[in-house]
Amino acid sequence: MTDIIIQGIYGRMGRALVEKIGAREDCRIVAGVDREAGRIGEIPVYAGFDALPCKGVIIDFSSPAGAVAAAQYGAANGLPCVICSTGLSREDEAALEAASTRTPIFRSANMSVGVNVLIELARQATKILGGEFDIEIIEKHHRNKLDAPSGTALMIADAINTEANGKYEYVYDRTQVRQKRGAQELGISSIRGGGIVGEHDVLFCGPDEVLTLSHSAGSRGVFADGAVQAALYIAALAPGYYTMTDLLRGKLICE
């Protein structure tokens, strides 16, 4: 039985995790961490890690600052962490990598298996089409999402750009530029509205045809499932920095 601590337990993803884990027999929630102390059913919730009396794998769905705090607490106390928050800066990501030298850190801005397959397909399409086709990414999310573009859109863009040896320049806004599209532009567009859980389209646009790779999340349960799988995966691993690619490919990065 794997014990799990959820940071951001009051949020949408926190509630989805409570529902998913409650139906499982291989793990359990021993505590939550959020802005205010309280309870969710039988689960105690603490207002910060300093008050936490128990141990377990930390799953973080909170904020950039919360993600760093979780990783640093995990590193100081030997607790594995699954970091799912988006909007992290380069400095935040560096802090996660530093923490991974002392405890297992699993990092993904999108815990969906399908999205990560989409990323692999985008890599392959870039290898075949990238020299002749323009590439655009369109992401859609609910009206309450704070960051734009989404962390997933940036994951896709980074995967494409790595495959293309870093030749692309990300373009988020064309309203101030009156000129033709540059050959090395990679456009990223964000849509916010209603209750859209998450949709990502990658367009490879040629002169006479368009290839579209698309993923749509039907509910937040898909992200909760992935986060739980990640928590079970890293629970007994050595310190290191792990990603969804490691989980999907079954690779263990242990030194």
Question: Which functions belong to the PLM regions below?
Answer:
Residues 45-49, 98-103, 122-125, 153-156:
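Short, hinge-like loop/turn segments at secondary-structure boundaries
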Residues 80, 95-112, 130-135:
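Rossmann-fold dehydrogenase core element
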Residues 12-17, 66-69, 115-118:
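Short glycine/serine/threonine-rich phosphate/pyrophosphate-binding segments
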Residues 3-52, 131-255:
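C-terminal substrate-binding/catalytic lobe of Rossmann-fold NAD(P)-dependent oxidoreductases
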